[in-house]
Amino acid sequence: MKKHLLPLALLFSGISPAQALDVGDISSFMNSDSSTLSKTIKNSTDSGRLINIRLERLSSPLDDGQVISMDKPDELLLTPASLLLPAQASEVIRFFYKGPADEKERYYRIVWFDQALSDAQRDNANRSAVATASARIGTILAVAPRQANYHFQYANGSLTNTGNATLRILAYGPCLKAVNGKECKENYYLMPGKSRRFTRVDTADNKGRVALWQGDKFIPVK
């Protein structure tokens, strides 16, 4: 199942997940009609944190994706790329796509380097901050094609993305298996060329519903 989801790469060193920087959603999307995206991060700890952010382009957001070169140096920009985030504070990070306006969907890993700080020396003459704990967090940004073609096929409880942009698909209604209760719901990201079968919702039931999002547009399927 995870092969059809946009994954999170999360590596910790010297810090527990509960203490890590809150970077919001695992996967973010920039629709075809937008060239900017804002992402709010939050420091929920009681100490200041030094945040450094780096971007990598990926061949795929799936487990077998490799880091590849960008088409141009300023293909994807962000600001700020480095900041000191006080305790219990939040900050908005902005991303700007300036790459090719073609029919290709592009994927990027946002790498967040998070370091907790403590004052090593508190005298006014010589004060320095030293990292005492750190984390490396990876999230995914998918940039839809500037020339997006949304197409799909649905049959017998299975959706296939025949277009060139990732779809957010969902099904809701009676559960397929009684052990799961009466009402079930499924949500997935479906990349171009991929298929997905719903396994919890009884889509064959008259009350079973299937729908998807094409960018910001909601499309009922069944």
Curated annotation (Swiss-Prot):
Induction conditions: Negatively regulated by H-NS. Positively regulated by IHF and EcpR.
InterPro entries to which the protein is assigned, alphabetical: EcpB_C (IPR040695), Ig-like_fold (IPR013783), PapD-like_sf (IPR008962)
Keywords on record: Chaperone, Fimbrium biogenesis, Signal
Signal peptide bounds: 1-20
Pfam family, any one: EcpB_C
Disulfide bonds: none
The organism's place on the tree of life at top rank: Bacteria
Function summary: Part of the ecpRABCDE operon, which encodes the E.coli common pilus (ECP). ECP is found in both commensal and pathogenic strains and plays a dual role in early-stage biofilm development and host cell recognition.
Family: Belongs to the EcpB/EcpE family.
Protein's name in the database: Probable fimbrial chaperone EcpB
Organism per entry: Escherichia coli (strain ATCC 8739 / DSM 1576 / NBRC 3972 / NCIMB 8545 / WDCM 00012 / Crooks)
